[in-house]
Amino acid sequence: MMYYPDVPALEPDELELLCHEYLEYNATLDPHLADQMGVKRGLRNLDGTGVLAGITNVSNVIGYDKKEDGTIVPIPGRLVYRGIDIDTLAAEADAHDRFMFEEVIWLLLFGSLPTQEQYAKFRKLLEHHRELPQGFADDMILNSPSPNLMNKMARSVLAMYSYDEHAEDNSLPNILRQSINLIAELPTMMVNAYQIKRRVYDRSSMYFHLPTEGQSTAEHILSTYRADQKFTHEEARLLDLCLLVHADHGGGNCSTFTCRVLSSSGTDTYAAISSAIGALKGPKHGGANLKVMHQLDYILENVEDPSNDDEVREFLRKILRKERGDGSGLIYGMGHAVYTMSDPRAQILKTHAKSLAYKKGYDEEYELLCSIERLAPQVFAEEKHGPKKVCANVDLFSGLIYRMLGISEDLYTPLFAIARVPGWCAHRVEEVEFANRIIRPAYKYLGKPQEYVPLEKR
């Protein structure tokens, strides 16, 4: 359903003419030329590793060792938040059966573990700021719905500028204030945007629940998302774990680097964070877990016996050869730019998803994902004949967890944004406080000289 009236549009023949004009004069950007000129396409080295573009204290992504001759040595993956492995954080949450995301927010923002008193006050602070400013929900969400929640969240964050008397103040106290507010408000923005999207575009009922006192971020999301506001402790803990493992991933990933680039220009917090949401919206960055679920359903529909390794292996081979699936040749949920032997996030989610999968009748889906994790590296090695190692990434199991929690596919990527905003804010603070230099890489110009011809002679 189109909510807004149609606007005047270019006719198809006009668009075709414009496309022809563009392609005629812009067909010279051959990727091989970039390689020959030593250009680091995608800010990647030839071995696939990222170009070193900055330094950070926020987090570290470890997936390989490098020998003196440049050879990459695969190792088990690690993700470290402010010097602490996420495995340690997840184990702590398990040992005491408690929510950990709020502690991770503090850790990423400030670099330390909060004391008990600081932790209690910080949770109260986040609770206090979950409600949106007076009139914001009506003006920015209810009266201007969007079929895409990431689009709506980016616009909502940008609009918060108008509700902040000190929006342009880039001092440390003010950026921290803005960061805490956005971290608290974004889940409410997401759920509200989803409800109005249901009403306008899906023609379904919408329902709005006020935040409940004493809830963690994960509990707040489930409570405001579900019509009956009911959820189990196990469900909330599993969602909290998803938020924990997605909270940050180094300074070089697309959305975080986008946030750093904008922050380096001296722009405001709302512009920087909305741009990060826009980057995460891209299917090459934040939408992979949805593609995993679509591919999982496709395999279940087309493989006679999903428990048979030989059948699954050969079907994965056909996907890799672009003979089946969406034609991309990608096995979604497998492979990563940094991790080689394992992605610690995937291992944490895999371990914790099993119990709920068997309780809720998703054991077939869970076991098939485990088979894909086990068989895909072998198929990849046989088909590609290269040295690159592939392993399951965080997307392989996160989509199944959201499905088991009854969460709409509309919210898969927005939940990623909810989890990642503390990391974005931590990197923004670091960029503004310490970098002090605008990020400005170079591009090699390949255009040909041409004479200017006066308009009357053309």
Where do the PLM segments sit?
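Non-transmembrane, aqueous-exposed alpha-helical and coiled segments at domain scale
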Residues: 2-458
